[in-house]
């Protein structure tokens, strides 16, 4: 059994059947609101890609994708996606989207090397979204404006759920707070990055941490990011304080994507310049792909947060070891 936290005296606010109904209602409302607020069109998404395309998300660079071959095309090494971070940018180009327009997908992924706990599963379901911007819009104001729009969807969703289920109380603050990862380190120099996240979220309730992937003044990173989609100076994580855990919980990771210059710079820093030869990276360096902003929003995380669940397995069906299943059952945590 991996790390498991049992909230003292936990009792679910909804039954199993009520939970399933609420999940559908919540997802439908959030999806519609997000699409309207960001001007997004839903598109079909791949479950797997060819390794040689360079389209899979390498995450932190050490996670192993699930891979397989197929009888019809034995020459291909096919990978289950980790996310669609790079695929979406290519799709905007292929589908001929215009400036100010975007797309979103229902993304399903398998992350086989995930460490299992209350909020982590090997099954990942999220809304992956991407939107075209101008090069001149690659700045912090564009990032913040987009974060505020997304936070508006979170606020509207909380209102919707509380109206449906009055015994669930509101906990989100009126506004989102912005802070850079360096400001956060300066504020809490003796804490780890995760401890900093909880400290700042306990103070403000909802926080967007700007600038993730590059090294801070201490020489450490706030967190890892793949070098070939987010610009590490124009990205961030959206976190909420979750009273049930007395911790910060990340609901979304997003950012303005790399341009030609930042891609080359970050590939060099990450010591993986060989990726420049992959088809996706070649298109980007040749100026064939649009400038974009995009991210992923965890569907199960959102359901868990708004329905006040103690374990992500209460809102999604996945794989858990017998010790975790038994311990959860003994503590009123009913895994699907």
Swiss-Prot record:
UniProt keyword list: Amino-acid biosynthesis, Asparagine biosynthesis, ATP-binding, Cytoplasm, Ligase, Nucleotide-binding
Any one biological process term the GO annotation gives: L-asparagine biosynthetic process
Main location: cytoplasm
EC number: 6.3.1.1
Disulfide bonds: none
Pathway in which this enzyme or protein is active: Amino-acid biosynthesis; L-asparagine biosynthesis; L-asparagine from L-aspartate (ammonia route): step 1/1
Transmembrane stretches, start-end: none
Single GO MF descriptor: aspartate-ammonia ligase activity
Location of this chain's protein in the cell: Cytoplasm
Catalytic reaction equation(s): L-aspartate + NH4(+) + ATP = L-asparagine + AMP + diphosphate + H(+)
Enzyme class: ligase
GO CC terms: cytosol
InterPro entries the record matches: aa-tRNA-synth_II, aa-tRNA-synth_II/BPL/LPL, AsnA
Membership in a protein family: Belongs to the class-II aminoacyl-tRNA synthetase family. AsnA subfamily.
HAMAP family documented for this protein: AsnA
Protein name, per record: Aspartate--ammonia ligase
Gene name of this polypeptide: asnA
């Amino acid at each position: 059994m991996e790390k498991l936290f049992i909230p003292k005296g936990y009792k679910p606010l909804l039954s199993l059947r009520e939970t399933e109904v609420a999940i559908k209602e919540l997802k439908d409302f959030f999806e519609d609101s997000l699409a309207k607020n960001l001007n997004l069109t839903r598109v079909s998404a791949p479950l797997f890609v060819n390794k040689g395309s360079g389209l899979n998300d390498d995450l932190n660079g050490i996670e192993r994708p699930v891979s397989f071959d197929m009888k019809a095309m034995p020459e291909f090494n096919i990978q289950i996606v980790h996310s669609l971070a790079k695929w979406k940018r290519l799709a905007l180009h292929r589908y001929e989207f215009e400036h100010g327009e975007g797309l979103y997908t229902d993304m399903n992924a398998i992350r086989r090397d995930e460490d299992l706990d209350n909020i982590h599963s090997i099954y990942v379901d999220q809304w992956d979204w991407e939107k075209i911007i101008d090069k001149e819009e690659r700045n912090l104001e564009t990032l913040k404006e987009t974060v505020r729009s997304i936070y508006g969807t979170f606020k509207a969703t909380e209102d919707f759920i509380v109206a449906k289920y009055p015994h669930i109380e509101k906990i989100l603050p009126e506004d989102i707070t912005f802070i850079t990862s360096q400001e956060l380190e300066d504020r809490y120099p003796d804490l780890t990055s995760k401890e900093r996240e909880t400290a700042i979220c306990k103070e403000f309730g909802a926080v967007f941490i700007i600038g993730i992937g590059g090294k801070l003044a201490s020489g450490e990173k706030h967190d890892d990011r793949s070098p070939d989609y987010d610009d590490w100076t124009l990205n961030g994580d959206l976190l909420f304080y979750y009273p049930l855990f007395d911790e910060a919980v990340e609901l979304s990771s997003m950012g303005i994507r790399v341009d030609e210059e930042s891609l080359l710079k970050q590939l060099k820093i990450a010591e993986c310049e060989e990726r420049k030869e992959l088809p996706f990276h070649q298109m980007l360096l040749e100026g064939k792909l649009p400038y974009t902003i995009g991210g992923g929003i965890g569907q199960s995380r959102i359901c868990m947060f708004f329905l006040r669940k103690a374990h992500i397995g209460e809102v999604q069906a996945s794989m858990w070891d017998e010790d975790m299943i038994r311990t959860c059952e003994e503590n009123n945590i009913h895994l699907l």
